């Protein structure tokens, strides 16, 4: 059973990488370059979900926001654009979950107010944890993020990278679970005005989530088939290479 995430007291840090990571946070142009890349990756993967679900092309209003991403001059402006992209995506979420027993309505968290939001919140936590594990295998410091500001919450870089993979791992797992009727109302519990997966529900979700992580797709960049789990690790190394000016970073986009 999933209990929690344990991480080392000391990271596998490299002095040069740490200084470059801090430099890319302090210098706005360098920070914005990375932050925009995360949002572009997120946007394209959200659009992939919509396009492959049979939703009419004219109903998809995400890709035009690429100009707003490029025009954003501050992280705050970019976060507003990102929120708008998510809002457009969530308008179609009930079509994606394809289950009249579980209505999305709107995004709610802390606490999630219904079953679909419970799935999203739990799945996102799983993703944050898995990306964090990937970061610990690199020389990057997870406390320095670019889209999500470095602050007292601790780790932020894992939140940045997760934006790219949540649509194609977490959301796809949710669509399969709801579409195949693998969960029922009995797999949830109500606690302090929120709705959460119970123990049996968590087991079912984790099973589908891990299946999605192991799913292999063709990576044009690598020229071979890779699991999403390996792609997530590769994404971390790509960011490290960008910081060291080995190769410019381009986010993973599922095509």
Show the residue positions of the predicted features.
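Active-site helix-to-loop segments that bind/position phosphate- or nucleotide-bearing substrates
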Residues: 14-255
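Glycine/small-residue-rich interface belts in oligomeric ring/scaffold proteins
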Residues: 1-14
């Amino acid at each position: 059973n999933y209990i929690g995430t344990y991480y080392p007291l000391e990271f596998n840090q490299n002095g040069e990488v740490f200084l470059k990571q801090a430099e890319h946070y302090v210098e706005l142009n360098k920070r914005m370059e990375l932050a925009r890349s995360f949002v572009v990756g997120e946007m394209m993967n959200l659009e992939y979900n919509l396009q492959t679900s049979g939703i009419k092309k004219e109903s998809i209003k995400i890709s035009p926001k690429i100009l707003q991403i490029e025009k954003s001059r501050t992280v705050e402006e970019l976060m507003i654009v990102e929120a708008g992209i998510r809002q457009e995506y969530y308008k179609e979420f009930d079509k994606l979950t394809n289950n009249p027993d579980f209505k999305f309505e709107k995004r709610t968290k802390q606490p999630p107010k219904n079953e679909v939001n419970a799935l999203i919140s739990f799945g996102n936590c799983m993703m944050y944890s898995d990306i964090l594990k990937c970061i610990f295998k690199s020389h990057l410091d997870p406390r320095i993020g670019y889209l999500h500001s470095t602050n007292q919450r601790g780790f932020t870089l894992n939140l940045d990278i997760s934006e790219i993979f949540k649509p194609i791992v977490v959301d796809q797992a949710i669509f399969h679970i709801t579409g195949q009727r693998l969960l029922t109302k009995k797999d949830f519990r109500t606690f302090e005005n929120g709705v959460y997966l119970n123990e049996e529900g968590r087991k079912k979700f984790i099973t589908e989530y891990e299946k999605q992580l192991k799913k292999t797709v063709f990576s044009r960049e690598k020229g071979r088939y890779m699991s999403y789990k390996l792609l997530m690790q590769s994404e971390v190394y790509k960011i490290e290479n960008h910081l060291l000016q080995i190769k410019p970073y381009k986010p993973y986009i599922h095509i």
